[in-house]
Amino acid sequence: MEELKGYLEKSRSKQQHFLYPLLFQEYIYVLAHDHGLNVNGSIFYEPAEISGYDKNFSSLLVKRLITRIYQQNYLINSVNDSNQNGFVGHNKNFYSQMISEGFAVIVEIPFSLRLVSSLEGKKEIPKSQNLRSIHSIFPFFEDKLSHLNCVSDILIPYPVHLEILVQILQCWIQDVPSLHLLRFFFHEYQNWNNLITPKKSNYYGFSKENPRLFLFLYNSYVVECESILVFLRKQSSYLRSTSSGTFLERAHFYEKIEQHLVVLCCNDFQKTLWLCKDPFMHYVRYQGKSILSSKGTHLLMKKWKSYFVNFWQCHFHFWSQPCRIHINQFSNFSFYFLGYLSSVPINPSAVKSQMLENFFLVDTVTKKFETIVPIIPMIGALSKAKFCNVSGNPISKPVWADLSDSDIIDRFGRTCRNLSHYYSGSSKKQSLYRIKYILRLSCARTLARKHKSTVRAFLQRLGSEFLEEFFTEEEKALSLILPRISYPLHKLYRERIWYLDIIRINDLVNHL
């Protein structure tokens, strides 16, 4: 790290922005090895039959790689003949993946420097660990969505041309060789047919070979797509992270806004700016899906739809289908977000009032943000994981049948607790109870299959200790508190609980 800081200080003093020479430094690949998104799947872990050494990480590979990079016209020759035993011929693009992992660390340097410089003038860096939680967005929904009228369900457009990704980074990185190297990676990954592909029609599936690089590229692309909302970030970015704020600082962005949007609205720039400053507009995104909600009219949402489609067309040079943006009223619309089926239903009620000797009924309407577990997609996810069949009937899991009894119970119990933890904010718990029932009975069937016994006999032998493994810590605490207080159990279990320690979506929920 000290060598890296020294190089960056030297480059800054000379007003240079060359990142390409860092590819010849061994510590870059060490950083990629230590801080990769998927360390166990890192390309630096070479099998013993390839390196000849019985160890996971081989520094010999890095030295061999740097030596080959130094060879004249090495990258060019490797592109012309990918079948040679060279850059892309060794172990199925082995060295190419090594360089791409190192390049993923290097390409993040300009953004890291920008983030550090933005924090230098601040005496105290605000602690926003709780805002990293996925659940932190739902209290925001509870406070805001119940007062809004319209919502636009948006799918971020894809696929994007690879050259556009290079042009996006060109605004940040002035090192031409690094951009050419990125084009080279695109050429190879495009041949592998696994660069960035649409998955389930709502978000991108990243390359398994280098998730860090392509996650970085995707985030850069998404920020560019959202650049139309730069005027709204002060009004609607309660949960904005610091890195996103530095991403949005673009010197030439206002020229793009003035060039494209003014033509679309056929009016002057000030009125366009007034529309963007709608104080009741809220924008939330997760993965490739975003939600734009407003208290305005349906006509206002149509204007925003036109802005999005035309801005993406002018800026990215491809046609974004208008059917990807659905405008609905909150009263009759439900949307999937972070594994929940969310809606804002209208609940009519009548209140009996009395004025002097006259009685009359007053009809009132209330709106409340509801979150429920989508049981049908969830059963489909459990079916893919072999916990039940497509009808939701629990089945045994033969893959775990060879484990010990304690390991089997622990795995099923951990899965059940994780899902209970994630879906603790559900408004209605019936679907969650059904998921718990499926996992408990699937565990019992797996144990009965292992011991060649029946499920009933096995449950009688284990008793209540078997069920305790499936209780969360909160449920165990409630079982101790409830006997001491007079509080309805059914009302307590209807309360929603949002946790501020969930930083990623549950694996089973991610299959929805």
Curated annotation (Swiss-Prot):
It is found in: Plastid, Chloroplast. The keyword NAD does not apply. GO terms for cellular component: chloroplast. Transmembrane segments: none annotated. InterPro entries: Domain_X, Maturase_MatK, Maturase_MatK_N. Its main location: plastid. The keyword Transcription regulation does not apply. This is Maturase K. The gene is matK.
